Curated annotation (Swiss-Prot):
Protein name stated in the entry: Ectonucleoside triphosphate diphosphohydrolase 3
Annotated ATP binding sites: G222, A223, S224, T225, Q226
All ranges on the Extracellular side of the membrane: 44-485
Gene: Entpd3
Domain of life assignment: Eukaryota
Main location: membrane
Membrane-topology descriptor: Multi-pass membrane protein
Length: 529
């Protein structure tokens, strides 16, 4: 009698199969593949790095009455309470006059931009050209041209639009902004770069500064001037000069007014027109605001061709007729005559009134005066804040200098500006003191500035800040430890290895089960014999 040992076929066959070298190697490879797959998946899921979405760029062309300036701004693509934290990175002055001077040849207007736009392309990373928005805002010069010749104004803008459509940037149009918009954007710029909206705390996070008052803005251009500030007193209901501004989660109620035809250049034309109206039998006209020893000839078209002076045209107006102005350098008479540029009587002793019958609440708090205000003060060797007495003394002293003395007095001599600084000084006095009602006590609260840090004080930055409210924020970028294509490739490779190993092991197990059954059948046959 034989005793037959029983065994589980699959277990014994599987054990014998797995005990052999190929099976062991395959099993090890399978386990390693599974470990690699699990490890890579956990790393990819649990350790992603969230990166900020990078920088965005914007370009604004400030098309003023006398020149065009190109500004490049950048800001983080994520936003602080829906407004981008914008900084100026580049500034370029376009050669030539303002775009309104191309009234008779609008097709030539864009040609002057080419040098600056070429530099802008270098400043903005090439891969961002297509997403960089570019805007052109035209101010008082074009506002006057539109009133005078709407067709010419439209053709100038169309020529510019056609030019920028051929550029790689995302051009968003050329438009004429209103005087009120110019005032608001200038106020936004001044307060932004002075840190009145945002500041960095100890953790380098942007926060709203506690207890900081806003700063009023005084802008003096070539064809208009703007005043903007948050009034301390309650303003007249439904006042057309009241604007609400929302930035960085806060809302400000702002008084702002733009005086068309009261920019430096247009105001001086009004002054020259007034001098021409004075009865005189002399061939030459005395100008107390021009330096002694200086004379220049203008055509009547230069003086009276503007919309601001057409009402002062003489009956026998001949635009090509020339008239010579002789400088006498008389500061007292200059100040006296410059007052006639304004209509102070229209306010009729009203306290809340500036000039020409325009409503204005009482000025209060600090102000920053920029553009023409700054350049005139700089010519008088003044900057920052100073007393009204200092301004008057410097004005009187400057106006007494002869024309031959001015080149040594000015750091940068240009005939057009040099001859007009005396007029501008007395004009600013009347505008700020008799117009806006600044006094001996409040005058020192005005700071005459060109820029703060690396940012120019101009309406263009405020314009860009307002536009970032409308530009979608960038989405955060998820930076994975392994790039998705690489991860998917590695995942597919080790998954395939694991499946092949598993299939091979199943094959070995199946083969040995078949062999074991054959051996059992053979053993039984032998036993029966």
């Amino acid at each position: 009698m034989f005793t037959v040992m029983t065994r589980q076929p699959c277990e014994q066959a599987g054990f014998r199969a797995l005990s052999r070298t190929p099976a062991i190697v395959t099993l090890v490879v399978l386990l390693v593949s599974i470990v690699v797959l699990v490890t890579l998946t956990l790393i990819q899921i649990r350790h992603p790095q969230v990166l900020p979405p990078g920088l965005k760029y914007g370009v604004v062309l400030d098309a003023g009455s006398s020149r065009t300036t190109v500004y490049v701004y950048q800001w983080p693509a994520e936003k602080e309470n829906n407004t981008g934290v914008v900084s100026q990175t580049f500034r370029c002055s376009v050669k030539g006059s303002g775009i309104s001077s191309y009234e008779n040849n609008p097709q030539d207007a864009p040609k002057a931009f080419e040098d600056c736009i070429l530099k802008v392309k270098e400043q903005v990373p090439e891969h961002l050209h297509g997403s960089t928005r570019i805007y052109l805002g035209a101010t008082a010069g074009m506002r006057l041209l539109r009133l005078q010749n709407e067709t010419a104004a439209r053709e100038v803008l169309e020529s510019i639009q056609s030019y920028f459509k051929s550029q790689p940037f995302d051009f968003r149009g050329a438009q004429i902004i209103s005087g009120q918009e110019e005032g608001v954007y200038g106020w936004i710029t001044a307060n932004y770069i002075m840190g009145n909206f945002l500041e960095k705390n100890l953790w380098h996070m942007w926060v709203h500064p506690h207890g900081v008052d806003t700063t009023g803005a005084l802008d003096l251009g070539g064809a208009s001037t703007q005043i903007s500030f948050v009034a301390g007193e309650k303003m007249e209901p439904n006042a057309s000069d009241t604007v609400q501004v929302s930035l960085y989660g806060y809302t400000y109620t702002l008084y702002t007014h733009s005086f068309q035809c009261y920019g430096q250049n247009e105001a001086e034309k009004k002054f020259l027109a007034m001098l021409l109206q004075s009865p005189s039998t002399e061939a030459n006209i005395s100008n107390p605001c021009y330096p002694q020893g200086y004379s220049t000839a203008f055509t009547l078209g230069h003086v009276f061709g503007s919309l601001c002076t057409e009402k002062q045209r003489p009956e026998s107006y001949n635009s090509s007729k020339s008239v010579t102005f002789m400088g006498t350098g008389d500061p007292r008479l200059c100040r006296e005559k410059v007052a006639s540029v304004f209509d102070f009587n229209a306010c009729q002793e009203q306290d809340a009134c500036s000039f020409d019958g325009i409503y204005q609440p009482k000025v209060q708090g600090p102000f920053v005066a920029f553009a023409g205000f700054y350049y005139t003060a700089s010519a008088l060797n003044l900057s920052g804040s100073f007393s009204l007495t200092s301004f008057n003394d410097s004005s009187w002293d400057f106006c007494r200098h002869t024309w031959s003395e001015l080149p040594a007095l000015l750091s940068r001599f240009d005939e057009t500006y040099a001859r007009s600084y005396c007029f501008s000084a007395h004009y600013i006095y009347h505008l700020l003191v008799n117009g806006y009602k600044f006094t001996e006590e409040t005058w020192p609260q005005i700071r005459f500035e060109k820029e703060v840090g690396n940012s120019s004080i101009a309406w263009s930055l405020g314009y860009m800040l307002s536009l970032t409210n409308q530009i979608p924020a960038g989405s955060p970028l998820i930076h994975l430890p392994i790039q998705p294509p690489v991860f998917m490739g590695v995942l597919a490779f080790f998954t395939a290895i694991a499946l092949l190993c598993l299939a091979f092991l199943l094959y070995l197990c199946s083969s040995f089960r078949t062999k074991e059954r054959s051996e059992n059948a053979f053993d039984q046959a032998v036993d029966s014999d």
